[in-house]
Amino acid sequence: KCDCSFRAGAPGFVQVLDEKTRAYPEYRGNGVLARVGNLLENPHIGMIFLDYYQTTVGLHVNGNARVLDPHEAAALPNLPAGMTEAAHSQGGRRPQAWILIGVEEAYIHCSKHVPLLTRQDKHITWGTDDERLKGGNFFKVTPAPPRS
């Protein structure tokens, strides 16, 4: 059993610390940091990086994850210059944790069936708990609260 959670960010939000180690910031999304809890229970992690806009090639990365608080992440050896500072500039948000990945395997994902997409503007309201903006009940599985 493994967690599967979507993550996206500006180019470089997943940092290469060395040949076998990656790190990325974990922000408050749904308010409960579910991904962090899931990784603490089961540290196996699988990631796929897809280039939808130019080559449509992907990269699979599988390994084990450790959850670090921001101070632990800042003390890592081989930290790329500005890594933690750059993470703070993403929409004015600060990471709640960092995920450190020990890479066990990585391989290319063929571009044959990956669609080529075009970029569209999308307004994002960071840090909101408004269900309409988050889309948290998109499939209507949670009963609507009674109207007053």
Regions found by a protein language model. Give the residues of each.
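Binding-site signature for planar aromatic cofactors or substrates
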Residues: 1-148
